[in-house]
Amino acid sequence: MWCLSCFKPSTKHDPSEDRFEEETNIVTGISLYEDVILRQRRSEADQIEWAIQDSFNPQETSRCRQREEDDQIARGLQYVEETELDKSVVDEEDQQLSKIVEESLKEKGKSKQFEDDQVENDEQQALMVQESLYMVELSAQLEEDKNISTIPPLNEDAQLQKVIWESAKGKGQIEHFKDPVEEDGNLPRVDLNVNHPHSICDGCKSAIEYGRSVHALGVNWHPECFCCRYCDKPIAMHEFSNTKGRCHITCYERSHPNCHVCKKKFPGRKYKEHPFWKEKYCPFHEVDGTPKCCSCERLEPWGTKYVMLADNRWLCVKCMECAVMDTYECQPLHFEIREFFGSLNMKVEKEFPLLLVEKEALKKAEAQEKIDNQHGVVTRGICLSEGQIVNSVFKKPTMGPNGELVSLGTEPQKVVGGCEVTAILILYGLPRLLTGYILAHEMMHAWLRLNGYRNLKLELEEGICQVLGHMWLESQTYSSSAAASSASSSSRTPAANASKKGAQSDYEKKLVEFCKDQIETDDSPVYGVGFRKVNQMVSDSSLHKILKSIQHWTKPDSNL
């Protein structure tokens, strides 16, 4: 049989149990303290170990720093992009508002009669509005941020009125009211005629009616008073530029042409112009080393290439195309000039050589002839009367790889003396027409010497020779088809002696006129004055009568 018993714990306190609990608590506390110390030591050991690892891994540290810097740069670029996007949005809103203002201004014209004047006024107001758009936009943004705006939304007309009012207020055209909002909540109406600082026309100095002004160059004008200083015609706003002053843009361009040399606008209004070719150029190009053609006297434009001859003379491309380069090439021209003198009944009987030479050879021959050139005239030809040795150009140069003339052939040639005329020397490399004029001039010197006209006054002798050169140039203007009729009507410039080289180019025709102009406008006391005096005598009489008069007045070898 089972027995069930009940057990009840004793509630009596045992002192030995208290001591055991205290010891247990002490042991537990010591254990916890040791755990804390152990964890601290482990944490310090871990930190030291991490520091040691970092010190042995500088590349990892550098990469971390580089990533941080890249993150900063990326954030900066993102900020700049957001700022530019906001600015583009503001610019687009400004353009839309400007279009609204312009359309609104065009619809508010007073009448069709003053439509043109109103359009000009609207353009001025639109410009004024555009100048103040940014300020108005910024002011509106500040007001919105401060949450102090109590003005209800405005319709399109009210917005336009506000913009114009703000702009006029900023320019001092209306008074600054303490409260820009009237009782009805709208902005006060703008009267642009109130306290207007520019109500007087700068042209006629009289008052300007509302809507009839043009604002330019910082002042106001009547439309009819704002005229071009070149053509005196009114200037429309689309024909005007502040940088060019009170003139049409087209008139300014015509009055301020580009330099023929550097193709730039002239500084100010100072420039030089060739008296014949009418080519305008900057004054400093005369001294800055710009090449000048020794034949036509034109300066070399940038982008072109002049040719330098062996004696350092420059020749332009057009003159080079028709230049006579050696003695052999000049012989047909020599025969042509002799025929020209024969047609004037002034045949040159004596045969003597014609030689093309370089500049130095010509100077040397001039010195041996004891010719005293005191008049600053460039010598391009000479009639010799003494025997000497001359370096003649017998082989024309060829064009080198860099555009220079090379392989010029010269040879010494003995000129035999004992005669009134021993030879004629002319610079090589000049155009055929200029060479022909010089040859005609020197041939007249030869004719005078061979016919006993010696010891003439220099002004008279050079004047006669210039007249013959001028006459030959005039003969070159005749066409071969008109030769017969011209020869019968004029004894001075027979067309039968027109150029035998064939049809002249347009440039050669112009070069003939240039050479004639050089003779006619020469201001030297010997060549220029002498030509004009003799030419006047020949015009009043004839060349033969003048020569006979000189022969009658004086005996050969006398001083006239």
From Swiss-Prot:
The keyword Metal-binding applies. CDD domains: LIM_DA1. Residues 199-269 form the LIM zinc-binding domain. It holds the Pfam family LIM. Disulfide bonds: none annotated. Residues 43-62, 92-111, 155-174 form the UIM domain. Keywords: LIM domain, Metal-binding, Repeat, Zinc. GO terms for molecular function: metal ion binding; ubiquitin binding. It comes from the Eukaryota. The keyword Zinc applies. Coiled coil: none annotated. The UIM domains bind molecules modified by monoubiquitin or ubiquitin chains and promote coupled monoubiquitination. Interacts with ubiquitin. Ubiquitin receptor that probably regulates developmental process. This is Protein DA1-related 7.
